[in-house]
A protein has these predicted regions:
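Conserved aromatic-histidine-acidic binding/catalytic patches
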Residues: 31, 94-98, 116, 171, ...
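Charged, amphipathic alpha-helical linkers/stalks
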Residues: 130-229
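Generic alpha-helix detector with strongest preference for long hydrophobic helices that associate
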Residues: 4, 8-9, 24-28, 87, ...
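Hydrophobic, Leu/Ile/Phe/Ala-enriched alpha-helical segments that form helix-helix packing faces
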Residues: 47, 186-187, 355
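Short, exposed beta-strand "edge-strand" segments with a Pro/Gly-rich flavor and a Y/T-containing core
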Residues: 28-35, 184-198, 359-362
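N-terminal cysteine/histidine-rich coordination modules
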Residues: 1-103, 107-152
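Hydrophobic, aromatic-lined core segments that form the binding pocket/scaffold
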Residues: 193-412
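Short, mixed-charge, low-aromatic patches
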Residues: 1-3, 156-160, 302-310
Length: 412
């Protein structure tokens, strides 16, 4: 009997299987596909008649990178596609040589594996259309569960987090599990609107920052318990109702974040289609006055988006929960926990801007459009770490990183 490892994973992973030529996307189109050193050497010495010419001409060493993980890369063809795909968008390397010849990047996508305190966690990126369907359309929400996997399975670990040990005794990371469990439960608390849940997360983060600044991290669990008790009272809902809505500022910031990405280049036709529909749906054309665009935004929201999202709010909830889990929030790759909050608010507000614009363009919304937007948005935005850092910097440099400004970005 094979030895197994325990892995924490969202339940949708059990149902995931690549759908190959039926897929709307090509996994590697317009991406940098890295090759690990072991795979690079296997390709360069392979004598397969069909693949050898491509192995010799379409694979380049990364001479400025000393890492064995990003040792080389595949050179995309003139259409920005992977030269190893056949006419059905299937991988010729897999077909000719088998799964064992795939690089770490190609064998793992769209799976994303981390290690937390010695235990593996695996989720998937929503940039894969099939993952988007499985993860986002589940009305019951994302359920995390422990499964057993073969110890000899090929698993590429992205990175991880250690919350144990004396060196972390006074650091926020020690309370990772308390913070994580609270916030995932918060995002799935349907007694509150999703807007309110994200605002409450910001309130909690500010409390955590204050305790950390005062050297009272040990009080974090008690504070989280107190917030759980407060959320059971109607008084908090009344306070949240008093937060003002400012569509003009919301539009200005969110549009600027979107422009920053579009102007830097977008390698996804599906996302560009969504952007064009968003701009047309909001009347965001050359010479348009901001007040007219704001009026159109509010009109789309009330006519089309509000009705749809009241019934399908779980789609956006599932997206945020998946990102929160996958990115090891509030830590992961972020410099501070507030940076992670700026990120989650930014992607949430950008997705809503697109959907509200698209709802005006199509005179309504349906799941297929919503999935297309979120999947292609994830492909373009979430897969560009430099852009993620740039939007955090833009928000900070503009002076819009306070909780009050974050609430304006969130509130619809």
């Amino acid at each position: 009997m094979n030895e197994t490892l325990t892995m924490l994973t969202p339940s949708y992973m059990k149902g995931f299987k690549c759908i190959g030529p039926k897929c709307e996307e090509s996994c590697c189109y317009a991406w940098n596909v890295d090759l690990d050193k072991k795979t690079y050497k296997k390709y360069k010495t392979n004598q397969n008649e069909k693949l050898r010419p491509l192995f010799q001409t379409m694979i380049n060493r990364r001479h400025n990178n000393k890492s064995d993980v990003n040792y080389a890369k595949i050179k995309m063809d003139s259409n920005k596609g992977c030269p190893f795909l056949d006419e059905n968008k299937l991988c010729n390397i897999h077909k000719e040589l088998g799964e064992g010849y795939l690089s770490n990047t190609c064998s793992s996508y769209p799976r994303y594996t981390r290690q937390v305190d010695g235990m593996l966690e695996q989720s998937a990126t929503i940039s894969c259309p099939e993952v988007a369907r499985l993860a986002l359309l589940n009305k019951e929400g994302i359920i995390l569960e422990h499964i057993e996997v073969d110890k000899n399975s090929r698993i590429s670990i992205n990175n991880g987090l250690n919350t144990e040990g004396y060196l972390l005794a006074n650091r926020l990371e020690k309370y990772f599990w308390d913070i994580r469990i609270f916030n995932i439960s918060l995002l799935q608390n349907r007694n509150y609107s999703l807007d309110d849940r994200v605002i409450i997360m910001g309130i909690v983060y500010k409390k955590i920052e204050k305790l950390n600044h005062e050297g009272n991290n040990r009080d974090i669990p008690a504070m989280l318990n107190a917030m759980n008790d407060l959320m059971k009272e109607d008084s908090l809902k009344e306070q949240l109702k008093g937060i003002p809505k400012n569509t003009a500022i919301q539009m200005k910031i969110t549009k600027e974040l979107t422009d920053k990405k579009v102007l830097s280049g977008v390698g996804s036709e599906r996302y560009l289609e969504c952007v064009i529909e968003t701009l047309n749906g909001l009347g965001f054309i050359e010479g348009a006055k901001l007040e007219d665009v704001v009026e159109k935004y509010d009109d789309n929201y009330n006519k089309y988006f509000k009705t749809y999202i009241e019934e399908k709010q779980y789609i956006l909830e599932n997206y945020l929960v998946n990102e929160y889990f996958r990115e090891l929030m509030p830590f992961g790759s972020f410099n501070t926990i507030w940076d992670s909050y700026i990120y989650i608010v930014s992607i949430y507000s950008m997705i809503k801007l697109h959907l509200i614009g698209m709802s005006g363009y199509h005179h309504g919304l349906e799941d297929e459009l919503t999935l297309k937007l979120i999947q292609s948005f994830s492909r373009v935005v979430v897969h560009t770490p430099s852009y993620i850092q740039s939007i955090i910097k833009l928000i900070k440099d503009s002076g819009f990183d306070s909780l009050a400004h974050m609430s304006i970005l969130i509130k619809s």
